[in-house]
Amino acid sequence: MLFPVSIKGVLLEAGRVVLLENEREEWELPGGRLETGEDPMACLVREFAEELGVSVIIKAILDCWLYEVLPARYVVIVTYGVERAGVEALRLSAEHRRLGTFALDELDGLPMPEGYRRSVRAWAAIAFTAKGSPARLPERGGASASRDF
């Protein structure tokens, strides 16, 4: 059985996570469908530009799981932790109903898949080390965005 793949990113702004409300009235992470032949990280950079008008640097892969979007309709979700690459203001595209930023303690009250909550908490734990700087992973090629993992 084949499933579509959706690449999502966790962006924390001043301790708050950026989320988008979809047509099912669920809050979700920015990102979208991986195109055939597309590098997953290039997909995420493209999706952040399309959905929020911002450029991002991909820092770490966080999680992967199978999500039942609708009854008997599944998608593989892959999440990454990201940081801003510029200072552009966040803007809402026509793909979503609303844009919101939420404190970590507000997540449990939101209609959203548990896997997204898990990814947000994982990135919050990784992103701020004792030194106050993001965790670093070794760089790998592929996406067109600058990455320093």
Residue ranges and their predicted role:
Residues 1-27, 56, 60:
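N-terminal strand-loop-strand
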Residues 2-4, 12, 72-75, 94-96, ...:
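A generic fold-level signal
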Residues 13-50:
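Conserved Nudix-box catalytic region and its N-terminal flanking loop in Nudix hydrolases
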Residues 51, 55:
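Short alpha-helical functional segments enriched in proximate histidine and acidic residues
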